[in-house]
């Protein structure tokens, strides 16, 4: 059931058919979220007044034919799975000259981890219900010939704030149709959840069970099973690290739960338990196997900390990159000009592709797209000069004291010596990061809990490797970026 390009489809369209105008049928409301490609809005159907979610994807972000095919495949897969009770149901698709719109069921109950944290208590028995749902989605995907490839907590939402809300899988942007026995080779997913065979670039549907096993480990302990200060360190742990069942809270967790995790996080895909077999495991089937006593509150606090990505750090890196001296930047300015052939001040996908070809690179189009995604901090579809420098400069230049002072001052607009929530709001607006939970962002960095960030807290954040990457593909995380592609030596000493 492989998706094939439709030969009759015009080259600048995603859908192989014409559609009515979205606004003739729906009223667009508030923004619900921002993804790598699209923005999701609340929308209301005019004829019924029913609320839905509308994911709007700007076509300017679809820079190559492969991107158009990816969106069309995502739509097909959503239709393919739409009868499953724990998959967000697609309502319809619309396309005009500027956007592709996917209208789907709206989920107003929040993300998986956020819901657990806000409840304030959690038990193994509750974890059973959640992982049973997740494994049920995986089993359904595999039985219908679909590999999800990006299972992570952010892709599971509750359909309502009620206690009996259903957990639903969303975002099939990396999902693919596959045939039994077929292997895939492109490295995609999210660092903590990726299976070892993905890193080895030869894998099948078993990767989804691994990712579900990682989610289960985090649900019960509040931390990922394979962790390191850097993303390359995380990958080393995934390939070689031992599962920790000795430190808290594992001594208090049932043996049955640990046995299931062992079987889901088996490194050999051939020996790994299938989704169906996992659903038949005693911990899931036998109600008495999973205790109902609350887990240690420390698990919840760790879970909250883990689920917040550090967005301030990304903004700060770009601020630093833009203030470095000509000498520190070296030949990067000339390289940027060489790639930016129309002198627009931004690099498009086509310019990046042409620039790489000129320096003799033999990267595939999908790999060049990966570099683009990794460098494009504000998801604009192009790389500006600041983003280019942030992607190509070595970190030890970024972390020098005077650069950290300058970045701190950028946020600390009134020079008070602290970054406040209002100043953070202002910076997020400038960077186009709307609807970001600022309270959580500050709490993550605010070590003395005074509600603001001082310079020492800011410096500690900048020098800590958080490894929380969410790139569409992970070439950047596999120690490969634009600097490598152009042969730039970003690691020269700063002497």
Swiss-Prot record:
Highest taxon of source: Eukaryota
Subcellular location: Cytoplasm; Nucleus
Location of the EF-hand domain: 327-362, 363-398, 399-434, 438-468
This protein's GO CC annotations: cytosol; nucleus
Binding-site residues, Ca(2+) 3: 412, 414, 416, 418, 423
Disruption of the gene: reported phenotype: Mutant cpk11-2 shows reduced ABA and salt responsiveness in seed germination.
Start and end residues of each Protein kinase domain: 26-284
Stimuli inducing this protein: By drought and high-slat stress, but not by low-temperature, heat stress or abscisic acid treatment.
Pfam name, any one: EF-hand_7
Catalytic reactions on record: L-seryl-[protein] + ATP = O-phospho-L-seryl-[protein] + ADP + H(+); L-threonyl-[protein] + ATP = O-phospho-L-threonyl-[protein] + ADP + H(+)
Residue positions, PTM Phosphoserine: 190
Binding site for Ca(2+) 2: 376, 378, 380, 382, 387
Region (Autoinhibitory domain): 290-320
Residue positions binding ATP: 32-40, 55
Record comment: activity regulation: Activated by calcium. Autophosphorylation may play an important role in the regulation of the kinase activity.
Keywords associated with the record: ATP-binding, Calcium, Cytoplasm, Kinase, Metal-binding, Nucleotide-binding, Nucleus, Phosphoprotein, Repeat, Serine/threonine-protein kinase, Transferase
GO BP term (any one): protein autophosphorylation
A GO molecular function held by the record: calcium/calmodulin-dependent protein kinase activity
Major place of residence: cytoplasm
Residues that bind Ca(2+) 1: 340, 342, 344, 346, 351
UniProt cross-references to PROSITE patterns, sorted A to Z: EF_HAND_1, EF_HAND_2, PROTEIN_KINASE_ATP, PROTEIN_KINASE_DOM, PROTEIN_KINASE_ST
Family of the protein in this entry: Belongs to the protein kinase superfamily. Ser/Thr protein kinase family. CDPK subfamily.
PANTHER family: SERINE/THREONINE-PROTEIN KINASE
Function: May play a role in signal transduction pathways that involve calcium as a second messenger. Functions as a regulator of the calcium-mediated abscisic acid (ABA) signaling pathway. Phosphorylates ABA-responsive transcription factors ABF1 and ABF4 in vitro.
Domain notes: There are 3 contiguous domains conserved in the CDPK subfamily: a kinase domain, an autoinhibitory (junction) domain and a calmodulin-like domain. The autoinhibitory domain (290-320) inactivates kinase activity under calcium-free conditions.
Protein name listed in UniProt: Calcium-dependent protein kinase 11
Organism the protein comes from: Arabidopsis thaliana (Mouse-ear cress)
Lineage of origin: Eukaryota, Viridiplantae, Streptophyta, Embryophyta, Tracheophyta
């Amino acid at each position: 059931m492989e998706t094939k390009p439709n030969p009759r489809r015009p080259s600048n369209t995603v859908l192989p058919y014409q559609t009515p105008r979205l606004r003739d049928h729906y009223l667009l409301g508030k923004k619900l979220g921002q993804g790598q490609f699209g923005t999701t809005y609340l929308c209301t159907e005019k004829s019924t007044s029913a609320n839905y979610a509308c994911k709007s994807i700007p076509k300017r972000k679809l820079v190559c034919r492969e991107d158009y095919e990816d969106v069309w495949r995502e739509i097909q897969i959503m239709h393919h799975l739409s009868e499953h009770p724990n998959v967000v149901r697609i309502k319809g698709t619309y396309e005009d000259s500027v956007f592709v719109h996917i209208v789907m069921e709206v989920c107003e109950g929040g993300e998986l981890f956020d819901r657990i944290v806000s409840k304030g208590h959690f038990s193994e028995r509750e974890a059973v219900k959640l992982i049973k749902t997740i494994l049920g989605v995986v089993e359904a995907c595999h039985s219908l010939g679909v590999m999800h490839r990006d299972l992570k907590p952010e892709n599971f939402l509750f359909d309502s704030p009620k206690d009996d809300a259903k957990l639903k899988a969303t975002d099939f942007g990396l999902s693919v149709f596959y045939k039994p026995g077929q292997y895939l080779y492109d490295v995609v997913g999210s660092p903590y959840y990726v299976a070892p065979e993905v890193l080895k670039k030869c894998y099948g549907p078993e990767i989804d069970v691994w990712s579900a096993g990682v989610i289960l480990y985090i649900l019960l302990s509040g931390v990922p099973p394979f962790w390191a200060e850097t993303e390359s360190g995380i990958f080393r742990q995934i390939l070689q690290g031992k599962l920790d069942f000795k430190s808290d809270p594992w001594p208090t967790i049932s043996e049955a739960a640990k046995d299931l995790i062992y079987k889901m996080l088996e490194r050999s895909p051939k020996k790994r338990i299938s989704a169906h077999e996992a659903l038949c495991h005693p911990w899931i089937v036998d109600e008495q196997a999973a205790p109902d006593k609350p887990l240690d509150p420390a698990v919840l606090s760790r879970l909250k900390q883990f689920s917040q990505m550090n967005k301030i750090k990304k903004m700060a890196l770009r601020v630093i990159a833009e203030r470095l001296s000509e000498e520190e930047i070296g030949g990067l300015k000339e390289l940027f000009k060489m790639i930016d052939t129309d002198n627009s001040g931004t690099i498009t996908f086509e310019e990046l592709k042409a620039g790489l070809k000129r320096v003799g690179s033999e990267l595939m189009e999908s790999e060049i797209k990966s570099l683009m995604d990794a460098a494009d901090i504000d998801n604009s579809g192009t790389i500006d000069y600041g983003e280019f420098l942030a992607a190509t400069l070595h970190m030890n230049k970024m972390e020098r004291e005077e650069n950290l002072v300058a970045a701190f001052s950028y946020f600390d607009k009134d020079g008070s010596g602290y970054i406040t929530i209002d100043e953070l709001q202002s910076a997020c607006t400038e960077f186009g990061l709307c609807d970001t939970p600022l309270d959580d962002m500050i709490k993550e960095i605010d070590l003395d809990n005074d509600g603001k960030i001082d310079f020492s807290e800011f410096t500690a954040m900048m020098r800590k490797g958080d490894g929380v990457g969410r790139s569409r593909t992970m070439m950047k995380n596999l120690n490969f970026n634009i600097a490598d592609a152009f042969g730039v030596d970003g690691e020269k000493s700063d002497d």
